[in-house]
């Protein structure tokens, strides 16, 4: 508060000066009136002199504080408060002088009837104001008209909370909250961004400053290499980025030619890789060069590269010490209000392990950074598991859920959970320019390559592989000494470099799935090299209800095959989804593949350029820190009614569309549903993942009572779910056709 001391002292000194001046002036007036009765000075003239002095003071004060957001709710000791104080002081002085003049006039003339310029009229001027001086002294605030709250679904609830809790932390009063609805509204619109800004309010200078720095695309990796060199944990990712550097540079240049990448705000972004911290107990970085899982490292390296090339300021953390150093300004801040001033970060990319570390490190300040989080989450987190109390009521004991974030803040490896956002990765092309020329000359052999580098994946698959072996050679890339489950006719190449694997795939006609691992990147790499993928069908579908692998994961998603993305979004002739236990079905697929000629195919979303486009759109358009959700645009909305027993994900998919959860809020009022020919004879609010829904017999609508429970997953047994679907760009399913 030291910053405001000069204003406070200045106003006190001026007040003292005015009181003294008024007293001396009054005495002089008395003396002058008695001595010079023939030329009485007008009280209005004297009043004008005092007002002129006050105007000069106010003008100087305004100049000193021109960068302060001023107004009736701007906080304590602002120019507005000083003006009100001065107004009260002047009014008091003028009233006293008016009484003094009246007494003098009575004393000299014996009556006040002939006084035409008496200041007794001054109080009537005050009465013309919206609020009287006495009201201001008693703390009454000016009324303000609240704007419409459409598009700000949380605003009303936040105002109700503030009415009960605004005294729980003195920081609210520091921001000008005084118990009135208008002060709540201004705080929630300008400090925490849950409500629309009042049109007459000036913009916060910090917000204005935020838009001064623009992002410029980068076309070299020097700064990023230097940044990542400090961490041995980043070695595998660093090597991947170096291998793909030329492709990335070409991609960012190509994207800049296709769409306008200028006038984008350069954002401060924290990237915290919890899985790579020593405290996590995982050894992903250590096993990366010896056959360990690479999916997370692939996704992280591609994300970091994209953020960097798009021109944002990134800071990378892979230890608790680094995290604390970056966030030290707010660590320990127990205030219920956000930290004032320049922001440390504006976006935070993190994983589930890092999420727990981040919350523990920040303590109470955590709540102010929740909306900035983007959580890398390969298998996804459905709303049912994300909502803490709802998950508890359903008996879910997963250690990965209950974060109470907007479900779209979870970023997945594939677009399998529409409630989440699809981040994806890049399918690497390991070849240099001379390789590319040579690879096109490679002739396809009558051979297949099995997708499974661990011996245990091959268990109980011999009959299935025998069918394939009847028609072609079977090759493998299994590592390790154990090969007991591998048939003797298989030609095992062991672990291959990325380059050698590409050449092997170019010689191969069929890439053979064994049913595990689920949803890996390898099938996409095979398809990109011209192989057909034999995709094992799961009947019944696999989920946490019947498969140990999914137990504990925060999703009830059902996998209909080893690779649902390839099944749904690619399909034939590149992907053949078959029942491994149906000999005829397998044989028919193998014969068809041998008789067809297919070209290499790579979905745009798994290229460098596709990922850059998608991440840029998310950074520019996705905003969970402000109440109004305007993206994707409403022009993309297509409303569908699901049949009982059918989820929104299913009904949208049947119509070649995607379920878009951000549109649910536009289908949660009776008047909104009328626009889409859904007429509610009656309605009620209910907190459940299966609503909004419609019961056609009675035309009864059930609307959502908790915004975090909007869900594309889940089927109602008797009601029709009211589903928000949207179109998508072929090869870029995360974006609608009007999204760019």
Curated annotation (Swiss-Prot):
Keywords: Disulfide bond, Glycoprotein, Glycosyltransferase, Golgi apparatus, Membrane, Secreted, Signal-anchor, Transferase, Transmembrane, Transmembrane helix
A GO term for molecular function: protein phosphatase inhibitor activity
EC number: 2.4.1.155
Residue ranges annotated as Lumenal topological domain: 31-740
InterPro entries in the cross-refs: GT18_cat, MGAT5_Glycosyltransferase, MGT5A-like_N
Membrane protein topology class: Single-pass type II membrane protein
Positions bearing carbohydrate: 109, 114, 117, 333, 432, 446
Binding site for substrate: 377-378, 553
GO cellular component assignments: extracellular region; Golgi membrane
Transmembrane segments: 14-30
Listed pathway(s): Protein modification; protein glycosylation
Entry keyword annotation includes Transmembrane helix: yes
Region (Sufficient for catalytic activity): 212-740
Class in the EC hierarchy, top level: transferase
GO biological process, one term: protein N-linked glycosylation via asparagine
Residues reported in the UniProt entry to bind UDP-N-acetyl-alpha-D-glucosamine: 525
Family: Belongs to the glycosyltransferase 18 family.
Protein name (database record): Alpha-1,6-mannosylglycoprotein 6-beta-N-acetylglucosaminyltransferase A
Gene behind the chain: MGAT5
